[in-house]
Swiss-Prot record:
It catalyses: glycyl-tRNA(Ala) + H2O = tRNA(Ala) + glycine + H(+); a D-aminoacyl-tRNA + H2O = a tRNA + a D-alpha-amino acid + H(+). Belongs to the DTD family. Pfam families: Tyr_Deacylase. Its main location: cytoplasm. A motif (Gly-cisPro motif, important for rejection of L-amino acids) lies at residues 137-138. This is D-aminoacyl-tRNA deacylase. A Gly-cisPro motif from one monomer fits into the active site of the other monomer to allow specific chiral rejection of L-amino acids. GO terms for molecular function: D-tyrosyl-tRNA(Tyr) deacylase activity; Gly-tRNA(Ala) deacylase activity; Ser(Gly)-tRNA(Ala) hydrolase activity; tRNA binding. It is an enzyme of class 3 (hydrolase). One of its GO terms (cellular component) is cytoplasm.
């Protein structure tokens, strides 16, 4: 699974103009299931993200995790994280998991992150979504697991 995480002061996702998920201070997590991903690898990535020390402590150092600060997570599926731009000018996305498996992995990731104790809200798999965020820092990290 690929994940692009962004530390945010707030983030929301809309489908057809209606907000379907939002978080206050915490993380926006864009995820893409990949062939070969397992429930175990997805859960491990979720656990790593929950414990990743990218929030400021009292001295201003990135030394606290999402769990430490009691932050939430907005999890949004994004198959374009599997883009192959090595040939031509149009990216290919065949490296992403097929849609049914991608949806299963997305749901498994959101559930695994919630099981760590993080308050999780989600987008809608396969929908055309409008994501709004205020990046804090900015802190943006690419992860694979």
């Amino acid at each position: 699974m690929r994940a692009l995480i962004q530390r945010v002061t707030e983030a929301s996702v809309r489908v057809e103009g209606a907000v379907i998920g939002r978080t206050g201070p915490g993380l926006l997590v864009l995820v893409c299931g990949m062939p070969g991903d397992t429930d175990r690898s997805v859960a491990a990535l979720a656990g790593k993200i929950a414990k990743l020390r990218i929030f400021r402590d009292a001295e201003g150092r990135m030394n606290r995790s999402l769990l430490d600060v009691g932050g939430g997570a907005l999890v949004v599926s994004q198959f374009t994280l599997a883009a192959d731009t090595s040939r031509g000018n149009r990216p290919g996305f065949s490296a992403a998991a097929p849609p049914k498996e991608g949806e299963r992995l997305y749901e498994a990731f959101a559930a695994a992150l919630a099981e760590t104790g993080v308050a999780v809200e989600t987008g809608r798999f396969g929908a055309n979504m409008a994501v709004a965020l205020v990046n804090d820092g900015p802190v943006t990290i690419w992860m694979e697991g």
